[in-house]
């Protein structure tokens, strides 16, 4: 059995998957915020409960919103302070007496989608998350690509390309990102960025779902906003896809529920790619909230 943990700032979610990659059981508990020992206990107790339930010693994979910094799994995870700066993988491996795999939650999302029955035919899969932030991951032949600093797929921290400024105007404000850099595309393409763009152009403070509801009602202002956002997304993706050249692009996160993104993006991309380039197949993520658990569990299928 394959145990996949999706760990976030509020919850620790465990999914147990069988050899056919089907979910057999899941359970969620609150994430301890201040005590590392309590955090380890919470994870280990879930593993022990799963072992007893299924009568096996399952493999353990963990997806967490952070970046492993060393081989022992020490990670930077601002949203999970109890585990940040701790040798999480090494400590869990010792306590559970088994190999524990650890990766960024966005990489786990991409891996989950790459291992979908319909998508395994594609050698190079790019996962793109358009949610609270912008992130993603790359999977080549069923294995996540991490890079020496574990930052592969941090697409949100690429800066706005020149074509974006041509589209938006050269007086378009370059916003400071939480990472400290200026003009990161996350500030414009995330759910929060989607709302910020609307306020910037129309001086109205609405959240993304409210703007999308107006678009669905045929509101002209919302329509113009969505057109501008999709053009900006296509411009930024043109740079990324020229570098990565994936066979499949899977889009997840809250904005992926807005069908116009997947249905209208494909027609905009070719003008931002090399003439000889083929745009990838574009699909909405298949596995929703279970994607993080799936991808973490499948870290043990990548050998």
UniProtKB/Swiss-Prot annotation:
PROSITE patterns in the record, alphabetically? ROK
> Which InterPro entries does UniProt cross-reference here?
ATPase_NBD, N-acetyl-D-glucosamine_kinase, ROK, ROK_cs
The answer to keyword Glycoprotein applying to this record is no
A single GO BP:
N-acetylglucosamine metabolic process
Entries under Pfam families matching the protein: ROK
Question: According to its UniProt record, which reaction does this protein catalyse?
Answer: N-acetyl-D-glucosamine + ATP = N-acetyl-D-glucosamine 6-phosphate + ADP + H(+)
Coiled-coil region(s): none
Say yes or no: keyword Electron transport present: no
Q: What induces it?
A: Expressed in mid-log phase, part of the nagK-cobB operon.
The source's superkingdom equals Bacteria
Q: Under which pathway is this protein filed?
A: Cell wall biogenesis; peptidoglycan recycling
Q: Name one GO molecular function term.
A: N-acetylglucosamine kinase activity
Which family is this protein grouped under? Answer: Belongs to the ROK (NagC/XylR) family. NagK subfamily.
Q: What does this protein do?
A: Catalyzes the phosphorylation of N-acetyl-D-glucosamine (GlcNAc) derived from cell-wall degradation, yielding GlcNAc-6-P.
Name the UniProt record assigns to this protein: N-acetyl-D-glucosamine kinase
Q: Which organism is it from?
A: Salmonella typhimurium (strain LT2 / SGSC1412 / ATCC 700720)
At the highest ranks, the source species' classification is: Bacteria, Pseudomonadati, Pseudomonadota, Gammaproteobacteria, Enterobacterales
């Amino acid at each position: 059995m394959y145990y996949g943990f999706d760990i976030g700032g509020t919850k620790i979610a465990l999914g147990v998957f069988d050899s056919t990659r089907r979910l057999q059981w899941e359970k969620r508990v609150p994430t301890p915020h201040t005590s590392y020992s309590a955090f380890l206990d919470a994870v280990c107790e879930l593993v022990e409960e799963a072992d007893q339930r299924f009568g096996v010693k399952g493999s353990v994979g963990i997806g967490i919103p952070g970046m492993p910094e060393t081989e022992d799994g020490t990670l930077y995870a601002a949203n999970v302070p109890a585990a940040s700066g701790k040798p999480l993988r090494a400590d869990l491996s010792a306590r559970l007496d088994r190999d524990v795999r650890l990766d960024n939650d966005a990489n786990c999302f991409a891996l989950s989608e790459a291992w979908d029955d319909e998508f395994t035919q594609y050698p190079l899969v790019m996962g793109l998350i358009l949610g609270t932030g912008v992130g993603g991951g790359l999977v080549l032949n069923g294995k996540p690509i991490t890079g020496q600093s574990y930052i592969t797929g941090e697409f949100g921290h690429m800066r706005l390309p020149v074509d974006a400024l041509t589209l938006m105007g050269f007086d378009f404000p370059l916003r400071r990102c939480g990472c400290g850099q200026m003009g990161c595309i996350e500030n414009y393409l995330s759910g929060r960025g989607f709302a910020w763009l609307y306020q910037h152009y129309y001086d109205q403070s609405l959240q993304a779902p409210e703007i999308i509801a107006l678009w669905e009602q045929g509101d002209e202002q919302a329509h113009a906003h969505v057109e501008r956002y999709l053009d900006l997304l296509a411009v930024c993706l043109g740079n990324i896809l020229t570098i990565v050249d994936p066979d499949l692009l899977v889009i997840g996160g809250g904005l992926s529920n807005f069908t116009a993104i997947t249905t209208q993006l494909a027609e905009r991309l070719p003008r931002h790619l090399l003439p000889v380039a083929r745009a990838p197949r574009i699909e909405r993520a298949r596995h929703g909230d279970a994607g993080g658990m799936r991808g973490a569990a499948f870290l043990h299928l990548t050998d």
